[in-house]
Amino acid sequence: MVDFRTYEVVKLEDVAEYARAKQGKIYPAGTSTLQISATRGEISFLSEQGYVHTKNVAIIPQAGIDPLYFNIAMQRNIDLFMHKYAIGINIQEHEVGKFPIYLHDYETQKAIVAMFRQLEHEMMVERDTVNVLKDLKNNMLSNMFV
């Protein structure tokens, strides 16, 4: 049963593998990245396999944790983490393991991911609508003084 109020708070090092990204290494889809050099806490997600810049830490969640949910959980807590562990504009690699993760059961993880995907879809539809209206406006303005 989906229950958003029941979760446990765990450290990243207990539920994921992490290491500074290596140049030329291909990381699997579902890898989250956290920029640790000259950063303001930028987190990204690999939706397909690819390379990760060496100023990032590549984070691969353990089996039983949805990779996109894991990324969402990281984005939720990045401000708290940065406030506590950032040293100037950098983060020490070993401190990444202390990142707090709010971990729901797998069914709830899937529900949260489905909601975020729906929101992303709706945002994309709205962006497309705005672009169509901009094109219409430009077309009308260019034809106004024919």
Per-region residue spans from a language model:
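Amphipathic alpha-helical segments
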Residues: 100-142, 146
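Short amphipathic beta-strand starts and helix->beta connectors
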Residues: 41-43, 80-86
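A short glycine-rich beta-alpha junction/loop motif
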Residues: 51-57, 87-107
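Short, surface-exposed secondary-structure edge patches
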Residues: 21-26
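Non-catalytic DNA-recognition/assembly elements of restriction-modification systems
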Residues: 1-20, 103-106, 130-132
